[in-house]
Structures are given as C-alpha cells and as structure tokens.
Amino acid sequence: YHFIRATLESIAYSTCDLASQMEKDLGQEIVSLKVDGGASRSDFLMQIQSDYLNKDLYKPTCIETTAMGAAYLAGLAVGYWKDQNEIKENWQIEKVYKNSISEEIREQRLKGWHKAVKYSMGWAKD
C-alpha cells in the first residue's frame, strides 16, 4: 500500500513541478486543469494533484479522450457533426476536484518533496 501511495504522490508532485515551470515559461497562471486518461480513475491522485497545485481539476464523464478524439474527427469528416463547437457541447464534467489543504501544509509537503529529490540526485553516480 505505501509503495502505491508513494508512486501516486510522486506523480502529483512531478505534475506540480511541471505546472509551476509552465507558468514561469508562459508568464501567466494556469487557472485549472482538465484531466483524463487512466490515471484520472484514481480519486486519490486527482485530489492530491488538486491539493498540491491549489487548482481545480475537471474530470470528464469519458476519460478515454484519445478514442473520443478519433471518433470526433471521423464524425467531422463524414458530416456527423457540423463543426468543433458542436463537439465541445458534448464535453461533460463528471467530477471537480478542489483543493482541500491549507497553504501551510501544501508548502510543507512540497518542501519535503524538493528535499527528497535533491538528496536522491546523489544516488546516481557515473
């Protein structure tokens, strides 16, 4: 159990680091995230991502967006949908994950993550 939890937490921490760097590179804040794919099946992962990012996460009713995208493109090609706006109307939210921790706890956990990453750098030697 602890190994699985640590793996999911590392995904959330890594996502937080990536989003932070993206905000710096873009020069603007990412307000919220839309999540999909197999990992979004984990309520635990989605909640801690929301907590660590301090952002709302929106999970659609259909998380298999690659397959849906292919179906939408095929539908557009044969005229089933008239345009992309009609497709966008099909997107429905199943669940919204909202931050549930204080800024103090978030900072403490992120500091611990960065400390662990720093220490692990010495483990790999040429």
Model-derived features: positions:
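Glycine/Thr-rich phosphate-binding loops that ligate phosphate moieties of nucleotide
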Residues: Y1-D126
